[in-house]
């Protein structure tokens, strides 16, 4: 193997060096503290699991993003987690088994078999929060508000929100009696806003049903879209009206809390259609071609773990937040240089300083004082009149 091959990393996998790593860790700690103030308890999930457990309740998209290997101990397939959300749902449904609302949060590395988009990392640091046990729009408003607080904490500029509801399309498709194949093809066409394809696929339906499905491709824009949707979908089934009412209630609450926040509605936005069951939302910023934070309601996932629970939540990537946000550089690394000595009184002084929060770097055999600056030290310990004292570093 050539020397150059020994330090090459797989595509989409990167090292994080000290200055950037320090910024990421500062933001991670700030976000977990923020979650704690909102009542969310921190959990840590395994990096690898048996595939059956890891993909339970998840859609095909997660299966495709999961890197799989054979466990040498059991011979079974195991996967590296590509999304922490299903793992946290299992903790709520199977491990904790609490009654009533349960708020959980997490932060950890995930691994994707393929990057989410061109030139993106395959090893993001996923940060998120989940609220279980409440099916009301108030829970969706809470997690969206918390997501916006996260973006505000790191000063991500010019954020705008996309909102949709998969229950609207699902209700219309169910009422139309579409086959699984046609429903999937129509879903794909709506995602691409391919109006001509939508018309062809709905041509065999009764006029009223076809018109409502075709309208979804055009129902995108500002707050006025919701009023237009109420008119276009007046003949829709009750479940569609319930979904639209939920979306309106959430939009109204966000408008009160964040009157300056641009809200964009897209009723054919079906991100996570096979996974989500209600409102879906995402935050975008100009110049970035994909969402920087996203989430939605996924009430069905708990059933796969033996206990169906309403659930809603969001996730984001810490690396992206630090890159896009206005995060202050880490404080300059300073410290105290201690000489290479076996003096027990020096050792006691070093330990006392460290317990007080000081950074103390002990010289190794053969190191000279000029290594102190390279070690980030601006002071040193000197023996004066039989006492070890902290003095400015003099080179």
UniProtKB/Swiss-Prot annotation:
Intrachain S-S bonds: none
Family statement drawn from the similarity comment of this UniProt entry: Belongs to the class-II aminoacyl-tRNA synthetase family. HisZ subfamily.
UniProt-recorded name of the protein: ATP phosphoribosyltransferase regulatory subunit
Additional comment: This function is generally fulfilled by the C-terminal part of HisG, which is missing in some bacteria such as this one.
Record text on subunit structure and interactions: Heteromultimer composed of HisG and HisZ subunits.
Compartment(s) of residence: Cytoplasm
Stored InterPro entries: aa-tRNA-synth_II/BPL/LPL, HisRS-like_core, HisRS/HisZ, HisZ
Pfam families, per the entry: tRNA-synt_His (PF13393)
């Amino acid at each position: 193997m050539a020397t150059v091959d020994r330090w090459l990393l797989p595509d989409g996998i990167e090292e994080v060096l000290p200055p950037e790593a320090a910024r990421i860790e500062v933001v991670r700690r700030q976000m977990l503290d923020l979650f704690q103030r909102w009542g969310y308890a921190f959990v840590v999930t395994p990096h690898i699991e048996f595939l059956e457990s890891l993909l339970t309740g998840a859609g095909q998209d997660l299966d495709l993003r999961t890197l799989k290997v054979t466990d040498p101990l059991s011979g079974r397939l195991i996967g590296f987690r590509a999304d922490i959300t299903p793992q946290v749902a299992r903790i709520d449904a199977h491990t904790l088994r609490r009654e009533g609302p349960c708020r959980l949060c997490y932060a950890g590395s995930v691994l994707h078999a393929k990057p989410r988009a061109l030139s993106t990392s395959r090893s993001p640091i996923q940060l998120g929060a989940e609220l279980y046990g409440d099916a009301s729009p108030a829970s969706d408003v809470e997690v969206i508000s918390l997501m916006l607080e996260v973006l505000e904490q790191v000063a991500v500029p010019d954020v705008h929100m996309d909102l949709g509801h998969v229950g609207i399309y699902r209700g219309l498709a169910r009422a139309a009696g579409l086959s699984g194949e046609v429903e999937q093809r129509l879903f794909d066409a709506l995602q691409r806003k391919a109006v001509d394809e939508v018309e062809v696929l709905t041509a065999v339906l009764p006029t009223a049903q076809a018109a409502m499905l075709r309208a979804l491709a055009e129902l995108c824009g500002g707050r006025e879209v919701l009023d237009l949707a109420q008119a276009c979908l007046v003949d829709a089934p009750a479940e569609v009206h319930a979904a639209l009412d939920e979306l309106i209630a959430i939009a109204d609450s966000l408008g009160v809390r964040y009157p300056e926040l641009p809200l964009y509605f897209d009723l054919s936005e079906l991100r996570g259609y096979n996974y989500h069951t209600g409102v879906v939302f995402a935050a975008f910023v100009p110049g970035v071609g994909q969402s920087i934070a996203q989430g939605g309601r996924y009430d069905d996932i708990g059933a796969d773990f033996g206990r169906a629970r309403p659930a809603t939540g969001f996730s984001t990537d810490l690396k992206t937040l630090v890159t896009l946000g206005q995060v202050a550089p880490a404080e300059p690394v300073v410290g105290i240089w201690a000489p290479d000595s076996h003096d027990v009184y020096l050792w006691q002084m070093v330990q006392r300083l460290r317990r007080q929060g000081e950074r103390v770097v002990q010289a190794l055999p053969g190191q000279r004082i000029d290594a102190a600056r390279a070690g980030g030290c601006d002071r040193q310990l000197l023996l004066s009149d039989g006492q070890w004292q902290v003095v400015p570093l003099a080179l």
